[in-house]
Amino acid sequence: TSLREFALSSSHLASSGALEFLEESQPLLWVGITGQKRCWLEQVEGTAAILNKLYEHYPNLGVVFDGWTPPLVSGDRSDYHRKESRKDNDVIQEIIKKLPSRKHRRFGIIAGLPMLEKIRIGMSVDLFVANYTTGSINIARICQKPGVGHMSNKMAYHKAQHIHYCTKVIDQELVEDQSDPENRVGYMDYSIPWQAIYNQLLEILIELKIE
């Protein structure tokens, strides 16, 4: 709670008025993007398909694209963190290109922003979709927002290590792990039909009574 309170009182974005445009959206969806390890293989085409379908039912939908979060103190690795943020931003731009009416949509890109700014933005979000593990810490664990978490079946065996409050997970039968020659749990990519994620998001929107 203290982190949330601090973020609410210390956000430069909020004090500048930059959040107001997004907060007028209904609903406001947080989309977590992974440009590095353990990613949803169809995240570009799949996320675009999900958003385009949601726009049919929710024309005032706003989207916050999240990605890499640099540590509170970057030290000598600031170049590395900028590079990782750019990877995520490249993925985000590919998704946005696939949204036909993007000129009239509300988007926010927060990949690379400090953790406190992300938490402040997360407090205004209605729901999220993101990787269940480290990719959703800010929105699911700290902001405690409802959402859909996706991960490989191999990672699902370790999901108890991650704190979630109201996150729906994808049925493991719909998840297909990508073979990793080194068999590293934390680096395994996975395939999921986008419709499985969309259906879970729709359930949450109905529960939230957002029309």
Stretch-by-stretch model annotation:
Residues 1-39:
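A nucleotide-sugar donor-handling region in carbohydrate enzymes
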Residues 1-11, 159-211:
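Leloir-type glycosyltransferase catalytic cores
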Residues 30-32, 64, 129-131:
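Structural motif
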Residues 33, 55-115:
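Catalytic donor nucleotide-activated moiety binding site of glycosyltransferases and closely related
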Residues 35-38, 69-72, 135-136, 153-156:
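Short, solvent-exposed loop/turn segments at secondary-structure junctions
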Residues 41-54, 82-95, 122, 198:
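Well-ordered, non-membrane alpha-helical segments in soluble/globular domains
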Residues 72-98, 149-151, 155-182:
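Extended hydrophobic/aromatic segments used for targeting, binding, or gating
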Residues 118-161:
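A donor-sugar binding/catalytic signature common to diverse glycosyltransferases
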